[in-house]
Amino acid sequence: MPLLKLVFLGTGGAVPRSDRTLPAIYLEDWLGHRFLLDAGEGAQYRLLQIGVSPASLTAVAITHQHEDHTLGLPGLVITSRFLGGRTAVLAPRSMHKALEALGVEVMDSYGGDRLRVSCVEVCHTVDACGWLFQWDVGYKLDLSKAAGLPRWALTSLIRGSPVEVGGRLIKPEDVAEPGHKRLRRLLYTGDTAPCPEMWRKVGEVDVLIHEATFADDVEPQKAHEEGHSTVADAVEAAKALNAGVLILTHVSSRYPDKRRHRELAASVKPPPHVYVPEDFDTVLVRL
């Protein structure tokens, strides 16, 4: 079953609170990939608190150079090295030279088992990547069309490979359920103002993790000039991207709690499903 596990290790931004630390999200998929999305100060300790070794990460995906998203990286890299690992880091190209000095493997995209991760340019005050995850979940077969096919053939068809049975070539599309969507997508924006050009380039996503630095007490124009978004901006992005799940994070320390963010998110009509997690909350998403 295509299932994502997201653990929100740090849901604040810029300045931490005692109960809201700096940006870091642990993502684990059903294929065994393990990613850390941004590495705010103390990220490795928070990973250890949920039982994840820094050396076990597939990669760390950094959105941009600001310190609240990067100060946890050096310690994590050193710990991983002591444990026999070598950290791979996805980052904007403007950061590559500095990261290479840390002795890490620097990449601007990732291609693994049925997963691709790529940078999409967002609208921040510095060079910044949103990270687009795209999984190939295979085909869901129409059992009436696939009746009588041997098990080995079904396995190959689900994985997207054509088969020859009894002298007949069968393509996955021939026996798939109509309208089945083979690719599933998650976008993590990092810091961004509303970014219609990015929305158009990306198209659609299933899950959107979007910053919501401000609720509704800051003039939108001021938020945008600082390269950030309000709750309403994040909702607009989710609608533009046709996201089924919207998760709001990077909440400013000016808010003692997230009550107003939740009230605003709850007023969204029509949904997507909207979550405003606290530090260490886990969200499971079935793709």
From Swiss-Prot:
Active-site residues annotated for this sequence: 68 (proton acceptor)
Highest taxon above the source species: Archaea
Cofactor stoichiometry and binding remark: Binds 2 Zn(2+) ions.
Organism: Pyrobaculum neutrophilum (strain DSM 2338 / JCM 9278 / NBRC 100436 / V24Sta)
InterPro entries named among the record's database cross-references: Metallo-B-lactamas, RibonucZ/Hydroxyglut_hydro, RNase_Z/BN
Chemical reaction(s) catalysed: Endonucleolytic cleavage of RNA, removing extra 3' nucleotides from tRNA precursor, generating 3' termini of tRNAs. A 3'-hydroxy group is left at the tRNA terminus and a 5'-phosphoryl group is left at the trailer molecule
Enzyme Commission identifier(s): 3.1.26.11
UniProt KW keywords: Endonuclease, Hydrolase, Metal-binding, Nuclease, tRNA processing, Zinc
UniProt record similarity statement: Belongs to the RNase Z family.
SUBUNIT field: Homodimer.
Required cofactor names: Zn(2+)
HAMAP family for this protein: RNase_Z_BN
Residues at which Zn(2+) 1 binds: 64, 66, 124, 191
Pfam families, A to Z: Lactamase_B_2
Classification via Gene3D superfamilies: Ribonuclease Z/Hydroxyacylglutathione hydrolase-like
GO molecular function: 3'-tRNA processing endoribonuclease activity; zinc ion binding
Enzyme class: hydrolase
The protein's name in its UniProt record: Ribonuclease Z
Function according to Swiss-Prot or TrEMBL: Zinc phosphodiesterase, which displays some tRNA 3'-processing endonuclease activity. Probably involved in tRNA maturation, by removing a 3'-trailer from precursor tRNA.
Residues that hold Zn(2+) 2 according to the record: 68-69, 191, 250
